[in-house]
Amino acid sequence: MVDPVAALCNYNVLEVIFSYLELEDLNHCSQVCKSWYHFLNDENSDVWRWHCLNKLPKEALKSDLLASVSTYKTKLRAYFHAWSPNDCSRNVYIKPNGFTLHRNPVAQSTDAARSKIGFRHGRHTWEVIWEGPLGTVAVIGISTKEAALQCHGYVALLGSDDQSWGWNLVENHLLHNGDMQGSYPLLNNAPKYQVGERIRVILDCEDNTLSFEKNYEFLGVAFRGLPDKKLYPTVSAVYGNTEVSMVYLGTPLDG
């Protein structure tokens, strides 16, 4: 019979030790034994809470931006998948909350940003929230590391080459390799995007497809035949002072 006092002491000791480890080390620890795996599998444990409160900006934790990621562990994961301050146009900066990009009011420029982490395997979903005016062109989608992040003029930069795929929210057009790939979604009089709506982007690296959801409604597959390359969540914008947030959700739920 397990002594409950000893079990509690063991729990408290693990809690203290794991709180001082790096996140990569926690992943290794979860593979040591079943006991440690179950301990770390509690995504709202004090260990994940401690790491979340110490690594995430307070601005993000105070807002409702992370409403779709309910546990401390998923909030941490979303933060490490957020926009990269080192992989964006010079006219873009990432706000202190770590999840929102701000495009500076620079004339005759189109500017883009990519996430910190890209995907080549598995299925992934993330939310994009456009929190400012769209302007004449506002594109969400994916790109490889080779896709440009800035160009002259006001254009659909994302989708302008063979390294990027995008949905222009202003005109409801799909874009790739500089060509319009058709209207999207395939609905009569499809409603236009409203500022503040959450769009879910679904990347399936097994089926090589990209799809979108809006208001929990699946809009259909937008792109097929994606290449076997690492693909990154990406947006491109033209409107000065507009802001776009991105929250990584993990594996999409079917149904």
UniProtKB/Swiss-Prot annotation:
InterPro entries: B30.2/SPRY (IPR001870), B30.2/SPRY_sf (IPR043136), ConA-like_dom_sf (IPR013320), F-box-like_dom_sf (IPR036047), F-box_dom (IPR001810), FBXO45-Fsn/SPSB_families (IPR050672), SPRY_dom (IPR003877), SPRY_FBXO45 (IPR035784). Component of an E3 ubiquitin ligase complex composed of hiw and Fsn. GO terms for biological process: negative regulation of gene expression; negative regulation of synaptic assembly at neuromuscular junction; neuromuscular synaptic transmission; positive regulation of protein catabolic process; proteasome-mediated ubiquitin-dependent protein catabolic process; protein ubiquitination; synapse assembly involved in innervation. GO terms for cellular component: cell cortex; neuromuscular junction; nucleus; pole plasm; SCF ubiquitin ligase complex. The keyword Protein biosynthesis does not apply. Required in the presynaptic motoneuron to down-regulate the levels of wnd and restrain synaptic terminal growth at the neuromuscular junction (NMJ). It is found in: Synapse. This is F-box/SPRY domain-containing protein 1. Residues 61-253 form the B30.2/SPRY domain. Keywords: Neurogenesis, Synapse, Ubl conjugation pathway. Residues 3-51 form the F-box domain. Pfam families: F-box-like, SPRY. The keyword Lyase does not apply. Pathway: Protein modification; protein ubiquitination. It comes from the Eukaryota.
